[in-house]
């Protein structure tokens, strides 16, 4: 058990405000080690958290949290924040079922002022809090901490545009971990940051404006001179054009620079902008050398680092990546698009082999969808690789720019269904409902790896938009054919027929829950259909099973409201067929973080749960296997 002499005394941020600068530096070392040790034992986000240790300490040291509001963007870099705000001893349960979240949550701590996990929301939220304080007459500051990646999203600039003219007492901290500062430039920037953030500079600046306000040409000349002087040392003054006072860049790992600069900015009125430079993986050489590999590792030995995983069943993401390369080699019209998820979406090899047809548009899902529409208008065949949860951010574009124009865009929806440790914010629970209600837009839910490849091929062959949803992780181990063959369009298949005359129950499985449905059916002697297509639904198969069975059961890894089960009920109603239907899927609640298999079992969507739900609804096992009354 490691000993942390200083960290063990920090139960809340107030405990670190009396520490000396030397003690704060020691605290940073202990905090970084605790983050590394914790993540190595549970898995989680590592590189980003190692890079925010000093910044987190400085923010809690300078600002009176939780009275002052810290709003973290994305939130996967908040482990140091969690440790310093009373959750040090709960890190062993990080992202585990029943443990603390890997992201800020308002219901977890008063220091988590705003729940998040998607990017680019912090400035908007912090502005709302700052103006609320003004309306209520409360004396407090709001601070948004946002990364350079999240600054590529339009929402961040919408918020900057609004905040700059609001006069709100707020600070935006840009955590820039995609550049570095050489020591000489860093020293100069430290001096300049202190100068720009200090009271003398601010007072002199305002005084000069007052003197020159009656001489506009001189005022404009002075403004341009100031910008020219700053431009020799700092980046673009775009943020000042938004109405912010810009300070930086400064070294985000240097407490001697961070603390006095933040103290100066804390006492200034109006919108302030601080640019800090950090390094992902800082303090752990292996993560510094390969921050992508250590972005979200599983359990590992810090002394040895990550080990290459033994060959196993391919993941659905890998199946997609291979299909993308194979189809691109066959059809030169294919172009691949990702909103900043190259590794996560399995597009690394595609970028290497087809660089001119690969587009990473940054964290800009709205743009990604409409960009794909523009490509499709010119005869290309765009494939947008995007997590199910992130397509939600481009929903208007999906309808307005793609579906209404009936453009042939393929959406590869990764992370559909339960995602596990990332929890409710990343769950792909809603895509079935929000996709199937849109005209022109089709949706396929393959059951395994080979069907995923075939579904993507079928989608690519269409002349209208199609989404293919598949889960995170590996499939069941089905062999993947090398040929680019397509699923029969709009057709499901029977995978098991009841034996011994038992024709009472038919299970209609959508997606990867086919396999637990088959296992449950063996216990109940039920018929099982692999539906494959949610839209267009194979109504012929649905009605055939309805006429030959006494009850239907639908199974899906998506929300029940508006889901695949609802589609089956609508089809039966339209045909005037009336029989009992049990719909199984995700409940009307946000599913918490935890191991996916345990979560599915908890939700009754594993084989045992499906069996028990059917028995509970339709009776004892002996009754289920008796011949159907009207069979």
From Swiss-Prot:
GO terms for biological process: 1-deoxy-D-xylulose 5-phosphate biosynthetic process; isopentenyl diphosphate biosynthetic process, methylerythritol 4-phosphate pathway; terpenoid biosynthetic process; thiamine biosynthetic process. It holds the Pfam family DXP_synthase_N. Binds 1 Mg(2+) ion per subunit. Binds 1 thiamine pyrophosphate per subunit. The keyword Metal-binding applies. PROSITE patterns: TRANSKETOLASE_1, TRANSKETOLASE_2. InterPro entries: Dxylulose-5-P_synthase (IPR005477), THDP-binding (IPR029061), Transketo_C/PFOR_II (IPR009014), Transketolase-like_Pyr-bd (IPR005475), Transketolase_BS (IPR020826), Transketolase_C (IPR033248), Transketolase_CS (IPR049557). Its cofactor is Mg(2+); thiamine diphosphate. It catalyses: D-glyceraldehyde 3-phosphate + pyruvate + H(+) = 1-deoxy-D-xylulose 5-phosphate + CO2. It is an enzyme of class 2 (transferase). Its EC number is 2.2.1.7. One of its GO terms (molecular function) is 1-deoxy-D-xylulose-5-phosphate synthase activity. Gene3D superfamilies: 3.40.50.920, 3.40.50.970. Pathway: Metabolic intermediate biosynthesis; 1-deoxy-D-xylulose 5-phosphate biosynthesis; 1-deoxy-D-xylulose 5-phosphate from D-glyceraldehyde 3-phosphate and pyruvate: step 1/1. Thiamine diphosphate binds at residues 76, 117-119, 149-150, 177, 284, 365. It comes from the Bacteria. Mg(2+) binds at residues 148, 177. Belongs to the transketolase family. DXPS subfamily. Homodimer. This is 1-deoxy-D-xylulose-5-phosphate synthase. It comes from Methylibium petroleiphilum (strain ATCC BAA-1232 / LMG 22953 / PM1). The gene is dxs.
């Amino acid at each position: 058990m490691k000993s942390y002499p200083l960290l063990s005394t920090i139960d809340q941020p107030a405990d670190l405000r009396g520490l000396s600068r030397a003690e704060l530096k020691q605290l940073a070392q202990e905090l970084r080690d605790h983050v590394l040790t914790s993540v190595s034992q549970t898995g989680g986000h590592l590189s980003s958290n190692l890079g925010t240790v000093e910044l987190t300490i400085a923010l809690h040291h300078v600002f009176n949290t939780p009275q002052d509001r810290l709003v973290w963007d994305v939130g996967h870099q908040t482990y140091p924040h969690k440790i310093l705000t009373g959750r040090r001893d709960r890190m062993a349960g990080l992202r585990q079922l029943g443990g603390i979240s890997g992201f800020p949550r308002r219901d977890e701590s008063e220091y988590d002022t705003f729940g998040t996990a998607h990017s680019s929301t912090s400035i908007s939220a912090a502005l709302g809090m700052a103006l609320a304080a003004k309306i209520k007459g409360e004396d407090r500051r709001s601070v948004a901490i946002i990364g350079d990646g999240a600054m590529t999203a339009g929402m961040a600039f919408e918020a900057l545009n609004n905040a700059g003219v609001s006069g709100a007492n707020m600070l935006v901290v840009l955590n820039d971990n995609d550049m570095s500062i050489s020591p000489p430039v860093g020293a100069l920037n430290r001096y300049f940051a202190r100068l720009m953030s200090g009271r003398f500079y601010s007072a002199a600046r305002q005084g000069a404006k007052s003197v020159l306000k009656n001489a506009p040409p001189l005022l404009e000349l002075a403004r341009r001179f100031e910008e020219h002087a700053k431009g020799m040392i700092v980046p673009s003054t775009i943020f000042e054009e938004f109405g912010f006072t810009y300070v930086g860049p400064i070294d985000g790992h240097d407490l001697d620079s961070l603390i006095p600069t933040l103290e100066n900015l804390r006492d200034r009125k109006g919108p302030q902008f601080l640019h800090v430079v950090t390094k992902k993986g800082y303090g752990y050489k292996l993560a510094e050398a390969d921050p992508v590999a250590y972005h979200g590792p599983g359990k590992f030995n810090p002394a040895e680092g990550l080990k290459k995983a033994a060959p196993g069943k391919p993941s659905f993401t890998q199946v997609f990546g291979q299909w993308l390369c194979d189809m691109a080699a066959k059809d030169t019209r294919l172009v691949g698009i990702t909103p900043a998820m190259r590794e996560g979406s399995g597009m690394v090899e595609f970028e290497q082999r087809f660089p001119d047809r690969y587009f990473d548009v940054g964290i800009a899902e709205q743009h990604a969808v409409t960009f794909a529409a523009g490509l499709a208008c010119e005869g290309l065949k765009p494939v947008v690789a995007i997590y199910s949860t992130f397509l939600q951010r481009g929903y208007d574009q999906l309808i307005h720019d793609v579906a209404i124009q009936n453009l042939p865009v393929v959406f590869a929806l990764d992370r559909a269904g339960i995602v596990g440790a990332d929890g409710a914010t990343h769950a792909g629970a809603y895509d079935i409902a929000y996709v199937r209600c849109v005209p022109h837009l089709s949706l396929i839910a393959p059951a395994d790896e080979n069907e995923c490849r075939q579904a993507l091929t079928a989608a690519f062959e269409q002349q209208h938009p199609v989404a293919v949803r598949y889960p995170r992780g590996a499939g069941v181990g089905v062999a993947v054919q090398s040929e680019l063959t397509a699923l029969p369009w709009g057709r499901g298949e029977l995978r098991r027929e009841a034996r011994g005359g038992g024709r009472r129950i038919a299970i209609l499985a959508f997606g990867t829950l086919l396999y637990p449905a088959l296992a449950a059916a063996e216990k109940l002697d039920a018929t099982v259909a692999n539906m494959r297509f949610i839209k267009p639904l194979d109504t012929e198969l649905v009605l055939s099973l309805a006429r030959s069975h006494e009850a239907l059961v639908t199974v899906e890894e998506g929300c029940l409201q508006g889901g695949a089960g609802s589609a089956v009920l609508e089809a039966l109603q339209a045909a005037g067929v009336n029989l009992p239907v049990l719909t199984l899927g995700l409940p009307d609640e946000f599913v918490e973080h935890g191991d996916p298999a345990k979560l599915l079992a908890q939700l009754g969507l594993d084989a045992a749960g499906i069996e028990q739900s059917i028995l509970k609804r339709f009776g004892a096992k002996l009754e289920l296997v008796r011949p159907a009354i009207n069979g």
